């Protein structure tokens, strides 16, 4: 398995990022994606829900069908999809000009990670963005 950036680099990318597209965000508060997206908002990130099945706002934000539909630049693409469904997300992230492809804990796709890296994205795989932010940056 490819190596993630070291913890210092992960901390730095979290500190310099302000926008996160949350791919696979659910409108159900009981879902992990919902809880983590809410935490990202509390940390000060502007989130963009990306889920073509959503019909209304989630956590106060209008959903988008794809990353490319988001009208402002996205720093991090945080992925809550099954590992086998990540390649189209990586392609969308590259096409949208995102900087980081972040695959949540349990999400591993070496092919998608290699594709994203070949196109200049930093890739973090099989890690929780909420835990890493709280641990590496801290919560005030």
PLM feature spans:
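Mid-chain, well-packed structural core segment of small domains
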Residues: 67-107
